[in-house]
């Protein structure tokens, strides 16, 4: 769903040349990819439901911790209003591909992400199923 939705909104593949073949092999490549990929669901307070190895390392969480975390907690309280505006814009427009902002890890380590693509996730029927973000540029601050 993540790769298909990215292609739907942006016309780009998640991993060029890797989206054919066995789904398990594709999932393993994405999990080990050198970029951060993270997603949340559709709950009133959306819970993270996917993070690849780079996301787990950046947010300093285990899979179990990540998939119990409300996505709003990836930003510090003063930055949550700005984050909410971003997600509302993505909901309205389908995606953005130039997001920059400050995030915070589980241990309180702050980092700035740059040139992130954030997009709506759609199921096979085109129903809204959450949002995902992809970025490969960040710096600790």
Spell out what each predicted region is.
Residues 1-27:
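Terminal domain-start segments
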Residues 25, 31-141:
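Sensory/regulatory domains in signal-transduction proteins
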